[in-house]
Amino acid sequence: MRLSQMLFVTLREDPAEAEIPSHKLLLRAGYIRRVGSGIYAYLPLMWRVLQKVSQIVREEMDAAGAQECLLPQIQPAELWQESGRWDTYTQAEGIMFALQDRQDRELGLGPTHEEVITAVARDMIRSYRQLPLNLYQIQTKFRDEIRPRFGLMRGREFIMKDAYSFSTDEADLKIIYSKMHDAYCNILQRSGLAYRAVDADSGAIGGSGSQEFMVLAEAGEDEVLYTDDGKYAANVEKAVSRPADAQPSSFKSVEKKETPKTDTIAKLCDCLQCSPTQVVKTVLYEAVYDNGQTLLALVSLRGDQSVNEVKLQNELVQLGDVVKGKALIALTVAEGGTKWASQPLPLGYIAPDLADSYIQKSKQVHGKFVRLVDQTAVDLKNFVTGANEVGIHQVGVNWKTDIPLPKHVVDIRTAQVGDRAVHDPKQTLQTARGIEIGHIFQLGTKYSQALGATYTNEAGKEQPLVMGCYGVGVSRLAQAAVEQSYDKDGIVWPVAIAPYHAIIIIPNGKDSDQVEAAEKLYSELNAAGIETLLDDRTERAGVKFKDADLIGIPYRIVTGRSLKEGNVEMVERATHDAHQIALDQVLPTLKEYLAKAIST
């Protein structure tokens, strides 16, 4: 392609809207253009990158035995209501674009396709002889992000590969899940990216287990905790660990102490001259479900630990039967002046045994607190906790003898850097930032049971299909590659997904020898399958060099002064290494470089 004929506009300054390097560079280099909040046009260079990523994904999915299809983007609300996710996606998380057609039928623009593919399977799969089956598509998805940011990282529409597998049982599902894990590793390796596969929370998708594939980058929105031995890695939302041991308590008997103005752990410990590890703090949460009912949760954990609200949400979803709720719409920490309280709450001084009488009778609010406690608090003896009176704490408290142990003992703490690993206490958790590129789930029968998707087994008995789902953000992967690989001059594309392999620059368009040599190389390289740009614009040489660095093409060939000796300059973008090479050696040299770069 000739740059003089391409839609190609670069910017010298960073756009004000862009926050992270990859977003700035993709805008500056003319890869994308903002059309609206979280909505971007993929320009010619970007589209070539996306096509290459898609092809790698397609090849690996096909190699793993998956079959490509294409599902509708507009989805009937009825399918989502059958699965119980319509309210979650349109109200709780609110990420689905919902609309009505001219016949007042409710529809949604697909953020994901579990319901649609399950409905297709329900209609078409009858027998175990048709299984296992794995279907995938590469398609634009839509999500109504409240605060779109970071360009293609968190947009309102994006390109995604999503696959859905159907099996006869869990053992069969795990075989496909393992194949998808390996396929995702291959996709990221072939794309030239450094990554980690980590244990993850399943979120609104659900299922019994999942893993995320994180491209490592400082600007990543996710925190990954891992051990140096390579045996553990997890998203902080899912991570488990062993915290440091609690310090022995200096309190030997139960006693109330005045602790004025100590509504934080730091103030309390300063007042009582104790360690946060000797404190049991209790946080009061309000959980609102899809049926409008509110459940009040008292959450107790060790004073030096923090609540992992993703883990807490999962626990509260399981407890939703108490109020006949299926999905959690909102989860907030209770504040003073709540309408449901029958009397002022002793916020900052709450104990795990706060009386249910604090809850005013109401049709919308469950009349009893649900009480959860983290194991870190269960292990404490002679601890400090609130006294349910403002300005008062209890010291020397023990479970069961002085205060009832909450019914639900769960893991609801946030694992932290420096914590000991569960699998080996000698290993401590390290941290890295990551960009989630892929997520694979073992769904089980969640959707097949909800939508009535069954098959007949060998014994002639009807059974629910056992499902898995597997997503890769194609457009997100492309931007993540930039976030992981750039320098002060611009983008440094991995060779496998670069829009072009090489760019030929004519420093002086008025020099017929330079033009002739460039034209000849351009024809030879493209004919040999080396995707090559020709910068034949009437711009100064300096502008051409800056643009070449900015757009990040792996190899730059300059038909400059060394032509007199029969040479051209070849520059590797990643290292800026430059050397002179004979004209007739450009093609074999580039072939060698590309083969090596793509194979590693």
From Swiss-Prot:
CDD domains reported in the protein's UniProt record: ProRS-INS, ProRS_anticodon_short, ProRS_core_prok
Listed EC numbers: 6.1.1.15
Gene3D superfamilies: Anticodon-binding domain (3.40.50.800), Bira Bifunctional Protein, Domain 2 (3.30.930.10)
Entry keyword Protein biosynthesis: yes
Residues making up the signal peptide according to the UniProt record: none
InterPro entries membership: aa-tRNA-synt_IIb (IPR002314), aa-tRNA-synth_II (IPR006195), aa-tRNA-synth_II/BPL/LPL (IPR045864), Anticodon-bd (IPR004154), Anticodon-bd_dom_sf (IPR036621), Pro-tRNA-ligase_IIa (IPR002316), Pro-tRNA-synth_IIa_bac-type (IPR004500), Pro-tRNA-Synthase_IIa_type1 (IPR023717)
Top-level division of the source organism's lineage: Bacteria
Subcellular location: Cytoplasm
Reactions it catalyzes: tRNA(Pro) + L-proline + ATP = L-prolyl-tRNA(Pro) + AMP + diphosphate
GO biological processes: prolyl-tRNA aminoacylation
Keywords: Aminoacyl-tRNA synthetase, ATP-binding, Cytoplasm, Ligase, Nucleotide-binding, Protein biosynthesis
Main location: cytoplasm
GO CC, alphabetical: cytosol
Enzyme class name: ligase
Record-stated family: Belongs to the class-II aminoacyl-tRNA synthetase family. ProS type 1 subfamily.
Domain notes: Consists of three domains: the N-terminal catalytic domain, the editing domain and the C-terminal anticodon-binding domain.
Subunit composition and interactions: Homodimer.
Main function: Catalyzes the attachment of proline to tRNA(Pro) in a two-step reaction: proline is first activated by ATP to form Pro-AMP and then transferred to the acceptor end of tRNA(Pro). As ProRS can inadvertently accommodate and process non-cognate amino acids such as alanine and cysteine, to avoid such errors it has two additional distinct editing activities against alanine. One activity is designated as 'pretransfer' editing and involves the tRNA(Pro)-independent hydrolysis of activated Ala-AMP.
Family annotation (NCBIfam families): PRK09194.1, proS_fam_II
Protein name (record): Proline--tRNA ligase
Organism: Acaryochloris marina (strain MBIC 11017)
Gene from which this protein is expressed: proS
